[in-house]
């Protein structure tokens, strides 16, 4: 007899179909359902299912087994480029006949100042050498943040930057270089083709499920208050013109 009505592996997907989670915007729910594997950083995939044995000449089946990586909470506050901590073993005193001891390999971290052209701000960020190489490969910090998918950024700070950049582009008339129209057009024309999305969608980029649920709750509360303010004058008019009918309706409701 099963212990649960539904298997635990689908609990997260079932949670999105009820309550306030089911009322989240469609574009945000689509991003949660996208399951793309991150780019391998600490290992190299074979890329094929079979390989020929060099000694026997026979075809052998191979399998891609990723190395378990631990991402500490500090990685969410910087840009580590997908790197993390790897736990393994090493020989004591580099002697293969000695006992193995545990070892944790950690990436080398640097603190660098990176400039965002869209936000017109310098950020002091903890990065790795791989992050700097990726920024150089796409010719700029803004391009790296906007082009890199969520699973490769693997950083809450990086997704917050992406949301801020997308909102700045969506609100270009008021927020993007308001004092310099020439620079505004130059920057906007550089990013408008691939990165401009509606403001309603940009507001949800990079939000965690808890943050999105809280945002949806506040939006629904605001809509109820606006509806109450809009209907209040009409209710006052009805009560003033036909007070006896309103009293009868209230009594019927209580009964």
Regions found by a protein language model. Name each.
Residues 2-255:
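Compact, Lys/Arg-rich rRNA/RNP-binding cores from ribosome-related proteins
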